[in-house]
Amino acid sequence: MGHRKLASPRRGSAGVRPRKRASEILPTPRSWPTIQSNEPKLLGFVGYKVGMSHIFMIDDKPTSPNYGKEIYVPVSVIETPPVIPLAIRAYVMGPKGEPTTLTEYWGDISEDLLKLIQQRKVTRLKIDKEKMKGKLDEINNKLNDILYLRVLIATQPKLVPSLGKKKPEIVEVQVGGGDIKSQLNYVLNILGKPLSVKDVFKEGQLIDIIGVTKGKGFQGVVKRYGVVELPRWHKHRKGSRKVGARGPSFSTPSYVPQPGQMGYHRRTEYNKRILKISDDPNEINPKGGFVNYGIVRNTYLIIEGSIIGAKKRPLFLRYPIRPSWIPQSAPKITYVNLYSQQG
């Protein structure tokens, strides 16, 4: 601003640029953690956001000033119907020094699920058992060259009537724990069978949540960047809800706040704690159901605090890539709010 004598701090974070719409509603992780486990397991799962509630629990974090006391905690609920592992992807080191796909082995899939998958693909998916046997032999012959294994999983939104959809989300999940041979045997045993979230995560542990935030549309700089509104005195014909100066006309610097898309961004929330995993919806459903969602009917997670995204939006749940602490067990929950959310 030309009339200022003191500098003002820059507005907005450069760490979340570009502020554009996400390319897909269910993002996949760009990196995966390494877990210390002798038993192989998937490093991620997919769930659907239900809403929020609150509970009372005994604080079990040793460094907390309320350790051992009953505390009030806002929580989020994620419904996690079983997923179906579809295929194995083996990755080896490519000629340019980057991991590349060696081959892809598909297991036995039911006809109903196969039809739903074909609706999501441009070309019709045909599974030739003879070719698949050859691909499995190729994986076994190159076990020493394989860097890691990943699994294609399909969600089952048809089990969640609140979503009003049947087409599954198909994502790739890395396998962790054990060695490559034990991982391959584990994946071959679960292909084509329903996999519960209890087979991936446990109560009390931390997870990372990857998803897309609520969309806000096209917004100005005051809401989008937190720019301070100019004083509305008798000389503000050039506007008050805008930046004082955008710089030279021939090239506007990238760090100057500009109006544009706000929300519907890909974001990752780290170290969200699973307080409870349950199969009994009666323990979480409020009277009348969750507003704008309905009634939980499948296995669900209770997550400490708020999470990103709108209700009914798919979220990717991943093992924590840098955990802040390692909970030893699940906390003791003394009360769960079941009162109606509709007043």
Swiss-Prot record:
Q: Work out whether the entry's keyword set contains Ribonucleoprotein.
A: yes
What does the similarity note say?
Belongs to the universal ribosomal protein uL3 family.
GO BP field = translation
Taxonomic lineage of this organism? Archaea, Thermoproteota, Thermoprotei, Sulfolobales, Sulfolobaceae
- Single GO MF descriptor: structural constituent of ribosome
> Subunit comment for this entry?
Part of the 50S ribosomal subunit. Forms a cluster with proteins L14 and L24e.
Q: Mind telling me what this protein is named?
A: Large ribosomal subunit protein uL3
Organism expressing this protein natively? Sulfurisphaera tokodaii (strain DSM 16993 / JCM 10545 / NBRC 100140 / 7)
- Name of the gene: rpl3
Stretches the record annotates as Disordered:
1-31, 238-262
